[in-house]
Amino acid sequence: MATATSHQSVVSFASLRSSPSSTISQCGFKIDSSLSFTSKKTNFCKIKAMASSVSYDNTLLSPSKTIPDNSQKKSNEAALILIRHGESLWNEKNLFTGCVDVPLTEKGVEEAIEAGKRISNIPVDVIFTSSLIRAQMTAMLAMIQHRRKKVPIILHDESEQAKTWSQVFSDETKNQSIPVIPAWQLNERMYGELQGLNKQETAERYGKEQVHEWRRSYDIPPPKGESLEMCAERAVAYFQDNIEPKLAAGKNVMIAAHGNSLRSIIMYLDKLTCQEVISLELSTGIPLLYIFKEGKFMKRGSPVGPTEAGVYAYTKRLAQYRQKLEDDSEVLCA
């Protein structure tokens, strides 16, 4: 497995925005119906290796969102938390879910709450989620457990009217809130004609080898669906354009999303190869912590619990944040 300091090539996203295989639709994209059961090979099975662990390549950012030079010079440190949503109703039923919008099970709700307890002492300034309810439920339930007790508020920018109607006019209330930004680009991989089918029955119908290829290969999509490679195109591009600039500015970010969109982002952060990422498994409701500093991502694993000493020993800033929470709590109890 590649480490955070290796310089292996992974996937190149030079042509992300001009991919001919997808266009935006209700689920965020529409898969070209010309896709077949065979691989639709593309040129970007290699991510550009960078001089630092993860550094900026401004050619991949849109001009309006290019990170200013002064933000790159700052030595801001920021936390990045990744959480796969809790168990969904279709996870429980062993169905292919993809972009079908199904809620959490009771177990999934408990997983989201437990995830929140694990990160309750880690600062969060902004939350990104997919546009799917299971990821949004996970984000909201997790943040309810945070010791700062700030209220997560979903931002609606789908229209000017939606923006106006959901406006908050109290500065005090705004200061006690955390913005939640939904993005279809963080949605689960679209499973095409497999969505809603039972996984076991699908294996019996098409053969175990064929279904395994659809599910675990990097560049072979299911019928009229996305490959992991195609999912990575949109997820990593969104991360580079919208999330990395927040981290560079010192904002602490949480992402609540899905197995394949998060695997894509981790592939980028950890510089995994195409072969390494297909064996990466993410459990539901388990948070992963990264520290972003001086243009580099440092993987810190998963917090075992809110009082795990190791999480706060990683950086002086996290230790100070936790101590402030303790001091504030003592003042309130006095």
From Swiss-Prot:
Entry keyword annotation includes Isomerase: yes
Single biological process term from Gene Ontology: glycolytic process
A GO molecular function held by the record: phosphoglycerate mutase activity
Sites annotated Transition state stabilizer: 258
InterPro entries assigned: His_Pase_superF_clade-1, His_PPase_superfam, PG/BPGM_mutase_AS, Phosphogly_mut1
Transit peptide residue numbers: 1-48
Keywords: Chloroplast, Gluconeogenesis, Glycolysis, Isomerase, Plastid, Transit peptide
Top-level class of the enzyme under EC nomenclature: isomerase
Function, as annotated: Catalyzes the interconversion of 2-phosphoglycerate and 3-phosphoglycerate.
Protein name per Swiss-Prot or TrEMBL: 2,3-bisphosphoglycerate-dependent phosphoglycerate mutase 1
Lineage: Eukaryota, Viridiplantae, Streptophyta, Embryophyta, Tracheophyta
